[in-house]
Amino acid sequence: MDLFEYQARDLFEKHGVPVLAGIVATTPEEAKAAAEKIGGVTVVKAQVKVGGRGKAGGVKVAKTPEEAYEYAQQILGMDIKGHTVHRVMIAQGADIAEEYYFSVLLDRANRSYLAMCSVEGGMEIEQLAVERPDALARVDVSPADGITEAKAREIVEQAKFDAETAEKVIPVLVKLGEVYAKEDATLVEVNPLVKTGDGEILALDGKVSLDDNAAFRHPEHAELADKTTADPLEEKAKENDLNYVKLDGEVGIIGNGAGLVMSTLDVVAYAGEKHGDVKPANFLDIGGGASAEVMAAGLDVILGDPQVKSVFVNVFGGITACDAVANGIVKALEILGDSATKPIVVRLDGNNVDEGRAILREANHPLITTADTMDAGADKAAELAHAAK
């Protein structure tokens, strides 16, 4: 989960990272009140999860609360690279003497963390990495140890900070490492990390991405989710512990196991080429459990997508036998009742496949069509979706 800047700032403050005052506002009136509370020069910053805010006019320096009101009025509702601005952060102005860059992220290839640091901050890090790779220090960090004081010292030495500044930056990097480790983040980035005219080190603009797989350790992270941009179907699936990703097609997909579901997406896309170019509408993995409740929750999510014209249930029975899956499908349709209106193609194979197919035949539900193979099921689902377009 990617956080907004104001949320990252709050996490930094929670862990002792030095930050400036910042208050989020959703109206010009709130922005003015925030500027009055902070006092002095403030910065009105669009809160969107995308870069390039400044160039798009989403960051303005306000000398008075009245200016903060005017700028908030301009920025709220603005479209920045496809993201609508619903809130701004009113941040205390800073006397910036120097700008630096720091980030720590997950390095999957090396099974470690990677810290990156530069004395040249404020610009796009991708641009710096290409144009002047020598200006960007890269230091491996052990997940077992994290960013210790010794590791932070190694980072600042490789980044070529002067001795005086290095001593001030080191404790800040340790605290940022603490944010990364204790919040189960996959990215913590500060650009810029600044030195003020008084020599103080501040995290001025932060980005944080949290690992959703660690959400069970952080129930408080649920409050950070952005309900204004979340897909309602994905939210419903998450509430039911379903692995669901919405796509842009017309054939709803339900399968057990990520590998099988991915293969099903490919087969449906291939079949759709000869049926009006229909495509998969989603990824939905029900995992090892195919109870009536789980199947009903999955079908409820998929059938709630108006783009879906047909559904393909592709299950290979293993620990969960095919007869249990078939019973789940039949009971799920009973639970959904009149809300289930779209044709469902079911392909079962594996443990107790004959019993499962028999259950579906005996149910004789008007929405259910069975298929013996994945290819045949995908072809039928694509055909039905095309006919309903």
Swiss-Prot record:
Keywords: ATP-binding, Ligase, Magnesium, Metal-binding, Nucleotide-binding, Tricarboxylic acid cycle
Metabolic or biological pathway, per its Swiss-Prot or TrEMBL entry: Carbohydrate metabolism; tricarboxylic acid cycle; succinate from succinyl-CoA (ligase route): step 1/1
Residue numbers binding ATP: 45, 52-54, 94, 99
Enzyme Commission number, as recorded: 6.2.1.5
An example Gene Ontology molecular-function term: magnesium ion binding
Top-level EC class as recorded in UniProt: ligase
Binding site for Mg(2+): 191, 205
Sequence positions that bind substrate: 256, 318-320
GO CC annotation terms, alphabetical: cytosol; succinate-CoA ligase complex
Gene3D superfamilies attached to this UniProt entry: ATP-grasp fold, A domain, ATP-grasp fold, B domain, Succinyl-CoA synthetase domains
Entry's cofactor comment: Binds 1 Mg(2+) ion per subunit.
Cofactor(s) required, per the database record: Mg(2+)
Subunit details: Heterotetramer of two alpha and two beta subunits.
PANTHER family in alphabetical order: SUCCINATE--COA LIGASE [GDP-FORMING] SUBUNIT BETA, MITOCHONDRIAL, SUCCINYL-COA SYNTHETASE BETA CHAIN
Functional summary from the UniProt entry: Succinyl-CoA synthetase functions in the citric acid cycle (TCA), coupling the hydrolysis of succinyl-CoA to the synthesis of either ATP or GTP and thus represents the only step of substrate-level phosphorylation in the TCA. The beta subunit provides nucleotide specificity of the enzyme and binds the substrate succinate, while the binding sites for coenzyme A and phosphate are found in the alpha subunit.
Similarity comment: Belongs to the succinate/malate CoA ligase beta subunit family.
Official protein name in the record: Succinate--CoA ligase [ADP-forming] subunit beta
UniProt source species: Kocuria rhizophila (strain ATCC 9341 / DSM 348 / NBRC 103217 / DC2201)
Higher taxonomy: Bacteria, Bacillati, Actinomycetota, Actinomycetes, Micrococcales
Gene that encodes it: sucC
